[in-house]
């Protein structure tokens, strides 16, 4: 139940923050709080269950992957770049998505391949699922779940086809994700299927907020710029 799980994630974050304060500490759910260290993620393991039978629609009676499984992966590959403002909602979120940092840089998919944006874990057929490794721990769980499941749903509805599974390193492939929040918002605004799915007014309002946040960030001159470019 994605809604119940989102409730649990929200409650967990609030609880951790409250306990930390009581111990005279601060807990952060920033995606990339420390330079040179891996960031903090919120990987989503997702599958689709038939409401009538309780069966995982990603596996058939013989235990093999179904067409719906591959359509779902293709939907993630197609629509997650435009959904990035929900998975990586802040300017800091994109610092986490770099090579050799236990975080993805593209939407290649592979079997038990942790260098890919989309990983298919080794599992029993009834537990067949896709791990979306893009979301950071700073993401709103309700929005991240809705965007990720929605992208997979669009792939199933449109019967999209995924790329071939990657057997090598995803870090050797080109970057295919927005590099910062401003680019991500532009992709979201251009993606009509996500607008139809999530609601035009909601997407327009959310994008406007994120554009404002990025503009405020962009006006700040960083210490790095002063150190290397001032003189």
Residue ranges and their predicted role:
Residues 1-2, 193:
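A broad detector of the eukaryotic-type serine/threonine protein kinase catalytic domain
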């Amino acid at each position: 139940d994605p809604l119940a799980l989102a409730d649990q994630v929200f409650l967990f974050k609030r609880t951790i923050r409250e306990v930390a304060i009581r111990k005279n500490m601060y807990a952060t759910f920033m995606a990339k709080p420390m330079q040179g260290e891996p960031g903090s993620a919120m990987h989503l393991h997702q599958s689709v269950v038939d409401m009538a039978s309780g069966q995982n629609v990603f596996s058939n009676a013989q235990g093999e992957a179904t067409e719906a499984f591959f359509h779902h992966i293709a939907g993630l590959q197609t629509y997650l770049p435009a959904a990035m403002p929900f998975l990586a909602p802040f300017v800091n979120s994109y610092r986490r998505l770099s090579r050799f940092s236990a975080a993805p840089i593209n939407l290649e998919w592979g079997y038990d391949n942790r260098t890919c944006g989309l990983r298919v874990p080794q599992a029993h057929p009834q537990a067949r699922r896709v791990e979306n490794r893009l979301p950071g721990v700073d993401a709103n769980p309700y929005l991240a779940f809705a965007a990720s499941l929605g992208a997979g749903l669009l792939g199933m509805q449109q019967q999209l086809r995924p790329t071939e599974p990657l057997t090598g390193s995803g870090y050797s492939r080109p970057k295919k994700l927005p590099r910062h929040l401003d680019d991500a918002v532009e992709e979201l605004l251009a993606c009509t299927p996500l607008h139809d799915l999530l609601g035009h007014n909601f997407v327009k309002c959310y994008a406007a907020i994120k554009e404002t946040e990025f503009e405020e960030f962009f006006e700040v001159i960083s210490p790095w710029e002063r150190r290397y470019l001032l003189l």
